[in-house]
Amino acid sequence: MSKHKVSPATIAKNKKALHDYTILEKFEAGIVLQGWEVKSIRAGKVQMVDSHVHIKHGEAWLFNCLITPLLSASTHVVADAAATRKLLLNRREINKIMGRIEQKGFTCVPLAMYWKGPRVKVEIALAQGKKVHDKRQAQKDKDWAREKDRLFKKAYK
């Protein structure tokens, strides 16, 4: 029997980002966490729905990622669920993201949080906002693909 508990690799996904943005390029970033945050992440108490990434003073920061503290969290440390958390990226990656964000219509959003060995990683992406008609067309394409799969499944039974 192993000492370490096996946990699924993906902790949380930001499905809203995939709906609202066209993803152009993805990056893997480390994240600076406190002990109680890691415990909460192991328990699955993470929400990434409205989170976003900003570059300030040459450093990447994750905003609005809610990590809800457990009831058994330390009482001598004030737990802020919506705290701003530092992302760990190479200088080259930060410069690339900064260059694209400064262009009109581009932003940086987190897509997923996952385990890579004992560490928590955040997948962030350079993205461009979708227009309403693009979202509608994407939904129509998804619906048609689902219907097509159903028809083929019935035809080949």
UniProtKB/Swiss-Prot annotation:
GO annotation, biological process: trans-translation
Listed Basic and acidic residues bias regions: 135-157
Predominant localisation class: cytoplasm
GO molecular function terms listed in the Swiss-Prot or TrEMBL record: RNA binding
Protein origin, superkingdom: Bacteria
Positions of region (Disordered): 132-157
Pfam families: SmpB
Location in the cell: Cytoplasm
GO cellular component, one term: cytosol
Keyword terms of this UniProt record: Cytoplasm, RNA-binding
Family: Belongs to the SmpB family.
Function summary: Required for rescue of stalled ribosomes mediated by trans-translation. Binds to transfer-messenger RNA (tmRNA), required for stable association of tmRNA with ribosomes. tmRNA and SmpB together mimic tRNA shape, replacing the anticodon stem-loop with SmpB. tmRNA is encoded by the ssrA gene; the 2 termini fold to resemble tRNA(Ala) and it encodes a 'tag peptide', a short internal open reading frame. During trans-translation Ala-aminoacylated tmRNA acts like a tRNA, entering the A-site of stalled ribosomes, displacing the stalled mRNA.
Name the record gives this protein: SsrA-binding protein
Organism annotation: Francisella tularensis subsp. novicida (strain U112)
